[in-house]
Design a protein with these regions (language model features):
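Single conserved hydrophobic/aromatic residue that forms the stacking wall/gate
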Residues: 1-13
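Bacterial N-terminal signal peptides
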Residues: 22-33
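Structural preference for beta-rich elements and adjacent junctions enriched in aromatics
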Residues: 36-232
Length: 232
């Protein structure tokens, strides 16, 4: 009789273990947000992007009109312990997207493909900006901006990016790790960063930015809008 009782206990433990496994599988299936993470594939289809900050106010900086009528670009922003994530949603007819590829840091002047870019002033001191650009074909450009508007593409960083083409436009996804550049230590829970996004549309040869300028204007770094991010 005692032996039989122990067997029943053992069977019950197996049953409970199997039940817990089934419950865990159900949670993963029906609550992917609890277990997912952003994969840099250009698709922007992870649950995390649904709660991202959004920016959709742009100025036309080439030609330099500062017109604010552009509404075909949306920026998504997230951050975690790995770094800062940026998603670009670019609406335009598919047959106008320029996917020409180039070697790293080439294809700037003249540009040969549609581009998304971001310049980051991590210390928000208007001294140094780090620029990261990906074109629709997946080619990249990176470098620094100093002395307000002087560009130097000799600097190369270790960052991730990907693009994807859809029927109504294209998207890009960028991860800039916190280790990409030296940053001043801050004692607060949040870090204030200067930031400017831009989009180049080759078929129209127009550039739109979230700051009122570009490196080709007299003022650039000093006119960056700022955002606050968690201080990891």
């Amino acid at each position: 009789i005692p032996s039989r009782g122990l067997g029943d206990v053992y069977k019950r433990q197996i049953y409970m273990s199997a039940r817990k496994q089934r419950l865990l599988i159900s949670l993963i299936a029906f609550c992917p947000a609890l277990f997912s993470e952003i994969v840099i594939d250009g698709l922007l289809n992870e649950e995390e992007w649904t709660s991202a900050r959004e920016i959709n106010e742009f100025y036309e900086v080439y030609p330099y009109s500062l017109d604010t009528g552009h509404n075909d670009t949306k920026i998504l922003i997230r951050e975690d312990e790995n770094g800062m994530y940026f998603g670009f949603i670019n609406t335009q007819p598919k047959d106008t997207i320029r996917l020409n590829q180039h070697q790293r840091d080439q294809g700037v002047r003249p540009p040969i493909g549609d581009q998304n870019g971001v310049t980051l002033d991590f210390d928000n001191d208007r001294r140094t900006g780090y620029r990261f650009i990906v074109n629709a074909g997946g080619s990249i450009i990176d470098g620094v901006v100093v002395n307000e508007n002087e560009m130097n593409d000799d600097w190369d960083g270790d960052w991730k990016q990907a693009t994807a083409v859809q029927e109504n436009g294209w998207t890009s996804e960028i991860l800039i790790p916190w280790s990409i550049a030296p940053m001043k230590s801050v004692s607060t829970e949040e870090r204030e960063i200067g930031i400017c996004f831009y989009r180049l549309i080759i078929s129209e040869f127009r550039v739109f930015a979230t700051c009122r300028g570009s490196p080709y204007q007299e003022k650039f770094l000093s006119i960056f809008p700022t955002i606050k991010v968690k201080n990891y």
